[in-house]
Swiss-Prot record:
Signal peptide: none annotated. SMART domains: KOW. It is found in: Cytoplasm; Nucleus; Nucleus, Nucleolus. Component of the ribosome, a large ribonucleoprotein complex responsible for the synthesis of proteins in the cell. The small ribosomal subunit (SSU) binds messenger RNAs (mRNAs) and translates the encoded message by selecting cognate aminoacyl-transfer RNA (tRNA) molecules. The large subunit (LSU) contains the ribosomal catalytic site termed the peptidyl transferase center (PTC), which catalyzes the formation of peptide bonds, thereby polymerizing the amino acids delivered by tRNAs into a polypeptide chain. This is Large ribosomal subunit protein uL24. Belongs to the universal ribosomal protein uL24 family. The lineage of its organism: Eukaryota, Fungi, Dikarya, Ascomycota, Taphrinomycotina. NCBIfam families: rplX_A_E. Its main location: cytoplasm. Transmembrane segments: none annotated. Keywords: Cytoplasm, Nucleus, Ribonucleoprotein, Ribosomal protein. It comes from Schizosaccharomyces pombe (strain 972 / ATCC 24843) (Fission yeast).
Amino acid sequence: MKFSRDVTSSRRKQRKAHFGAPSSVRRVLMSAPLSKELREQYKIRSLPVRRDDQITVIRGSNKGREGKITSVYRKKFLLLIERVTREKANGASAPVGIDASKVVITKLHLDKDRKDLIVRKGGKVE
């Protein structure tokens, strides 16, 4: 049963919208929840991830790993995190991409725009 006549419930159209999304929309799709401490401090639940945020992986084979985001790979919907790597066949290390939904933000990289975003979402910046 459809709840809204304005939003399609077609799987085909939802997948097209997701995988054909422009970078500006992918930024919002790549949001992650804040840790409980940050949630109490800023009074918001989640934010789009960005480079230099500190995160903890909470799902998958890399569960428990912590580190700083070195790159947000929007084209593939992945985060590259320092110290989350694997060894290649030739002995070199390669970063492992982690999905934004599998992490929790533990420390925010705050600048003027980020503070404005938190206030706009109804949170508090101290």
